Swiss-Prot record:
Region (May be required for interaction with Fadd) residue spans: 132-178
GO MF annotation: an example: death domain binding
Positions of the record's site feature: Cleavage: 30-31
Assembly with partners or alone: Interacts with Fadd. Interacts with faf. Interacts with Rpt6. Interacts (via N-terminus) with Usp2 (via N-terminus). Interacts (via N-terminus) with scny (via C-terminus). The N-terminally cleaved form interacts (via IAP-Binding motif) with Diap2 (via the BIR2 and BIR3 domains); the interaction promotes ubiquitination by Diap2 and the E2 ligases Uev1A, ben and Ubc5.
Domain of life the protein comes from: Eukaryota
Job description of the protein: Essential for the imd/NF-kappa-B (Imd) humoral and epithelial immune response to Gram-negative bacteria. Functions as an adapter protein that transduces immunity signals from the activation of pathogen recognition receptors (PRRs) by bacterial infection to the Imd signaling pathway. Binding of diaminopimelic acid-type (DAP-type) bacterial peptidoglycans (PGN) causes multimerization or clustering of PGRP receptors which activate the Imd cascade probably by recruiting imd, Fadd and Dredd to the receptor complex.
Disruption phenotype: RNAi-mediated knockdown in the fat body results in reduced expression of the antimicrobial peptide gene Dpt following infection with E.coli.
Taxonomic source organism: Drosophila melanogaster (Fruit fly)
Gene responsible for this protein: imd
Entry-linked PROSITE patterns: DEATH_DOMAIN
Region annotation (Disordered) ranges: 1-63, 134-159
Gene3D superfamilies assigned to the protein according to its UniProt record, in alphabetical order: Death Domain, Fas
Official protein name in the record: Protein immune deficiency
Region of interest called Essential for ubiquitination and the induction of Dpt, as start-end residue ranges on this chain: 143-177
Length: 273
């Protein structure tokens, strides 16, 4: 409105319109300098910020520690975190704040000089006790090949082929029933294979088991099969030599040793008669 009056002073009339008083504009008033001594311009009620010029703060210390840890792997920034005195907190209050800085450029270099038998990784030991197994096998084989003497001591030459055993292997006589009784008594596991080697069929073995095991035992079955072998064989086939050789080669040597005692007794009787 004041501008319109200045442009058209004759319309509104009056001396005031012709000679208006100078009025400061808003821009001139806002841009005028402010006197600090005036009470309205005092900033005492505002928040006073402490001057930090030239004084390192905790944030600057942490930034510097991060840079130092990235450049130096041996530098520990946690020492700076614990030693930094952050404003507004008590120094004796323990905090759980932690900071871990990891750098992909860090490398661990280990130098070894004059090292012998250097090993990395786990070590696994397996004890198989090979010596114990071998000694146990050796003792088992020794026990099988030796027969105890009357005084209880093992006899090393128990399974040795003696002169009497060689004579039995060369004998062409028909086995006596007393020899058959010794064989049926002392022939153990593997007796079926012995019967097969003597020429007995599976049917004959099964029939003997059915006929005689119900009324006796395996001893009776073996005895009846030996009798059947002698009766069904041709002349000169069922001999003491054939039976002794078969039992010796089949590792039934203990049975042969017991046959020898009976055979020597029979031969002695023949000589005396």
């Amino acid at each position: 409105m004041s501008k319109l009056r200045n442009l058209l002073p004759t319309i509104f009339g009056g001396k005031e319109a012709q000679n208006p008083t100078p009025v400061e504009g808003r821009l001139e008033k806002d841009a005028a300098p402010v006197d600090d001594n005036e009470p309205d311009n005092n900033n005492s009620g505002a928040l006073a910020l402490p001057s930090t010029a030239g004084t390192p703060t905790a944030s600057s210390d942490l930034t510097e520690s991060v840079l130092r840890e990235l450049s130096d792997p041996n530098y520990n920034s946690m020492d700076v975190v614990h030693s930094a005195n952050i404003p507004g907190t008590l120094s004796n209050v323990q905090t759980n704040n932690t900071m871990n800085v990891h750098s992909a450029q860090q490398q661990v270099v280990m130098n070894f000089s004059n090292a012998n038998n250097l090993h990395f990784g786990s070590v696994y030991n397996f004890n198989q006790n090979l010596s114990a197994c071998s000694s146990r096998k050796g003792s088992t084989s020794t026990a099988e090949e030796s027969v105890a003497s009357p005084d209880g001591k093992p006899r090393a030459s128990a399974t040795r082929k003696t002169v009497s055993i060689v004579a039995m292997m060369q004998s062409q006589e028909e086995p006596d029933v007393r020899l058959l009784d010794v064989v049926s008594t002392h022939l153990g596991e593997g007796w079926k294979q012995v019967m097969r080697d003597l020429g007995m069929s599976e049917g004959q073995i099964d029939q003997a088991i059915i006929d005689h095991q119900m009324h006796g035992n395996i001893r009776e079955v073996i005895y009846q099969l030996l009798l059947q072998w002698i009766r069904s064989s041709a002349d000169g086939v069922a001999t003491v030599g054939r039976l002794t050789t078969l039992l010796w080669e089949s590792q039934h040597r203990d049975c042969v040793q017991r046959m020898k005692l009976v055979w020597k007794a029979l031969e002695k009787r023949k000589t005396n008669s």
